[in-house]
């Protein structure tokens, strides 16, 4: 787990997210508290639970991005799910425990990727040897299933080759490393999942269908088949196969479970949509309240059964978010409110924020569009006045229509650059400066016709 200080975490988040300093400080403290907890003796460590957070603010102000960047920064398993996808136990739909199973899958993939990186050098060497075995099969008869490197019988594979064979093998090794054999086709043996029965699950019951399919799949052994591919593709397949042999999946599952339990982050979006309000009524409110009650034990701490073993949720950090346009946090049932003790309100964005979003982040929209058009050898640049005009229009359209936050910049930039994107292949080698007049010209029809702007922007 990352041991960055709160100030360093906020500094890293500032590279991608503009403003929202209160929210950044709160999540930075929450992340630092996880590191602090790991430094405590076990008997006290187990008593300290994470302080879950509710983020309130309109769409497009950075709620999801803050949580996503935080998880990436800390190297933690992170899963985002909309609270509206869940249904009360007993109804058709996803149960709330499915998000813990999804988080565990992400943890497995994260740890497996790290373990594969550790054995990468050894796997590449084994894959290269296996490739040369295919290109230069030995004269001795092969055992069944010996289409490539077999670590179970190294003494048989390492019989003393003749000088000519060694020389030829090294020549082929050199040619392979220089890329001279990339277009050549070879036949390799690959594993094929044993034939099972495909279970078609009902909408909302995909988790059950996947578990049944997985269970049936294990009843059928994997089969081997020969496949003809280019050498470069064969090398990638062999690396994957050799890595799988070198990795202990039981150890991966154990490490992943530990990481999920101690450092996992579950992001519950649209939490306001399951809050009961006075406008609706009847069965709708009852159903929403049922989902909230199902969330209680998971957020408080329980044990969820996954195909990799039991996962405790006691120390998973839950971050929930919602616009709360038609509901308030107090509309959540009191028990759930108590399990999210920290609350922070994210502010709406104005033209100054939009300008900073266009210029400051490492992945700013202007940087992205420049890079895209440079692939066609078309160089574009934006004047300061042009970006100020874009920011002003973003604020204006958000005020006059629906406020969708920074996402408004996507629609405006697409409208401004649509002609250049279409003509880019024909304007290879050109350099264009986009100024204020160009922006005004491209947006003229939608700025003058308010009804049209509702549909276009």
UniProtKB/Swiss-Prot annotation:
CDD domains: RecA-like_HslU
Keyword ATP-binding appears in the UniProt entry: yes
Positions of ATP binding: 18, 60-65, 269, 335, 407
Region (Disordered): 142-171
Location within or outside the cell: Cytoplasm
A GO molecular function held by the record: ATP hydrolysis activity
Keyword terms, alphabetized: ATP-binding, Chaperone, Cytoplasm, Nucleotide-binding, Stress response
Residue ranges crossing the lipid bilayer per the database entry: none
Annotated GO CC locations: HslUV protease complex
Domain of life from the UniProt record: Bacteria
GO biological process: protein unfolding; proteolysis involved in protein catabolic process
Subunit structure: A double ring-shaped homohexamer of HslV is capped on each side by a ring-shaped HslU homohexamer. The assembly of the HslU/HslV complex is dependent on binding of ATP.
PANTHER family reported for this sequence: ATP-DEPENDENT CLP PROTEASE ATP-BINDING SUBUNIT CLPX-LIKE, MITOCHONDRIAL-RELATED, ATP-DEPENDENT PROTEASE ATPASE SUBUNIT HSLU
Protein name, UniProt field: ATP-dependent protease ATPase subunit HslU
Organism: Maridesulfovibrio salexigens (strain ATCC 14822 / DSM 2638 / NCIMB 8403 / VKM B-1763) (Desulfovibrio salexigens)
């Amino acid at each position: 787990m990352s041991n960055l200080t709160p100030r360093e975490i906020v500094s890293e988040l500032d590279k991608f997210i503009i403003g929202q300093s209160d929210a950044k400080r709160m999540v930075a403290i929450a992340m630092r508290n996880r590191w602090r907890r790991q430094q405590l003796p076990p008997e006290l460590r187990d008593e300290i639970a994470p302080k879950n957070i509710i983020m309130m603010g309109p769409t497009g102000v950075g709620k999801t991005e803050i949580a996503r960047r935080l998880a990436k920064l800390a190297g933690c398993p992170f899963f985002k799910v909309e609270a509206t996808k869940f249904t009360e136990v007993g109804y058709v739909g996803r149960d709330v425990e499915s998000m813990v199973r999804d988080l565990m899958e992400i943890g497995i993939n994260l740890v497996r990727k790290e373990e594969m990186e550790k054995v990468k050098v050894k796997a590449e060497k084994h894959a290269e040897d296996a490739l040369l075995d295919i290109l230069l099969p030995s004269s001795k008869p092969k055992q069944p299933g010996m289409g490539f490197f077999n670590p179970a019988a190294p003494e048989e594979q390492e019989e003393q080759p003749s000088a000519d064979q060694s020389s030829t093998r090294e020549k082929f090794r050199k040619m392979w490393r220089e890329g001279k054999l990339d277009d050549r086709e070879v036949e390799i043996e690959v594993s094929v999942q044993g034939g099972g029965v495909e279970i078609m699950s009902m909408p909302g019951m995909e988790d059950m269908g996947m578990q049944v399919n997985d269970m049936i799949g294990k009843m059928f052994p994997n089969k081997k088949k020969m496949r003809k591919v280019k050498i470069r593709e064969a090398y990638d397949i062999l690396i994957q196969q050799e890595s799988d042999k070198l990795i202990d999946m039981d150890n991966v599952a154990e490490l992943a479970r530990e990481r999920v339990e101690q450092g996992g982050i579950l992001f519950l979006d649209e939490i306001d949509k399951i809050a009961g309000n006075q406008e609706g009524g009847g069965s709708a409110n009852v159903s929403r309240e049922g989902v909230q009650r199902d969330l209680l034990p998971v957020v408080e701490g329980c044990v969820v059964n996954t195909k990799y073993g039991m996962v405790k949720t006691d120390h998973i950090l839950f971050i929930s978010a919602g616009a709360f346009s038609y509901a308030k946090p107090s509309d959540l049932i009191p028990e759930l409110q108590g399990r999210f003790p920290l609350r922070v309100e994210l502010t709406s964005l104005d033209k100054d924020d939009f300008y900073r979003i266009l210029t400051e982040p490492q992945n700013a929209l202007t940087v992205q569009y420049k890079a895209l058009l440079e692939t066609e050898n078309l160089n574009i640049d934006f004047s300061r006045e042009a970006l100020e005009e874009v920011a002003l229009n973003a604020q204006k359209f958000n005020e006059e229509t629906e406020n969708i936050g920074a996402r408004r910049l996507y629609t405006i930039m697409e409208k401004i650059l649509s002609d250049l994107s279409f003509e880019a292949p024909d304007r290879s080698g050109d350099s264009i400066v986009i100024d204020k007049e160009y922006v005004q010209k491209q947006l003229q029809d939608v700025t003058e016709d308010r009804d049209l702007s509702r549909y276009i922007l």
